[in-house]
């Protein structure tokens, strides 16, 4: 059955939104994996666990926001298989933060690509929606992760375990 409310919402944009929803759910799944990795008894970094579990929740909420917009525009949500995280062992906080920045940059690029598609399709509602709810948040998160990465790299040296512990205690406990 076709939508009664669909107006100026191309099938290309609809498909791209569905792909972006999948990317957000995959990111949420990855952050959940990261969070519970740092919650393990042999890793035990509570602040790092909390940081990544909060990100998992934020990405799930982002997927839901996209799905709600899809329905409001008369599009159809088509769920795809969710790919498991690329790894099960995440190593150090430094390794995990590097992986997280790569993930966030890929999400940001997908958002920019969708925004460009919306502009090309003359869809100002989509562009405004992305600008209001996603693009600024992504830039701020990438900056925050970059700052965390810089601080971790400063602390990690010959005393890598101590540096990781201090970062977790002094930085992530206050986020």
Swiss-Prot record:
SUPFAM superfamilies: Ferritin-like
Role description: Stores iron in a soluble, non-toxic, readily available form. Important for iron homeostasis. Iron is taken up in the ferrous form and deposited as ferric hydroxides after oxidation. Also plays a role in delivery of iron to cells. Mediates iron uptake in capsule cells of the developing kidney. Delivery to lysosomes by the cargo receptor NCOA4 for autophagic degradation and release or iron.
PANTHER family per record: FERRITIN (PTHR11431), FERRITIN LIGHT CHAIN (PTHR11431:SF47)
Record-listed Fe cation binding positions: 54, 57-58, 61, 64
Positions carrying N-acetylserine: 2
GO cellular component terms, A-Z: autolysosome; autophagosome; cytoplasm; cytoplasmic vesicle; ferritin complex
Protein name: Ferritin light chain
Disulfide bonds: none
Subcellular location as annotated: Cytoplasmic vesicle, Autophagosome; Cytoplasm; Autolysosome
A Pfam match: Ferritin
GO molecular function: ferric iron binding; ferrous iron binding; iron ion binding
Higher taxonomy: Eukaryota, Metazoa, Chordata, Craniata, Vertebrata
Region (Catalytic site for iron oxidation): 54-61
Native source species: Equus caballus
Family: Belongs to the ferritin family.
């Amino acid at each position: 059955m076709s939508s009664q409310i669909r107006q100026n919402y191309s099938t290309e944009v609809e498909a791209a939104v569905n792909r972006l929803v999948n990317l957000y759910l995959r990111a949420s799944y990855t952050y959940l994996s990261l969070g519970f990795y740092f919650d393990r008894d042999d890793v035990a970094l509570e602040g790092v666990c909390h940081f990544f579990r909060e990100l998992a929740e934020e990405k799930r909420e982002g997927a839901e926001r996209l799905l709600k917009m899809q329905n409001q525009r008369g599009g159809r949500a088509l769920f795809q298989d969710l790919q498991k995280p690329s790894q099960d062992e995440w190593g150090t906080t430094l390794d995990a933060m590097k992986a997280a920045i790569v993930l966030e940059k890929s999400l940001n690029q997908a958002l920019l690509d969708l925004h460009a598609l919306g502009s090309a399709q003359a869809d100002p509602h989509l562009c405004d929606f992305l600008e209001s709810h996603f693009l600024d948040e992504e830039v701020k998160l990438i900056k925050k992760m970059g700052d965390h990465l810089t601080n971790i790299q400063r602390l990690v040296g010959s005393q890598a375990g101590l540096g990781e512990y201090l970062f977790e205690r002094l930085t992530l406990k206050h986020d």
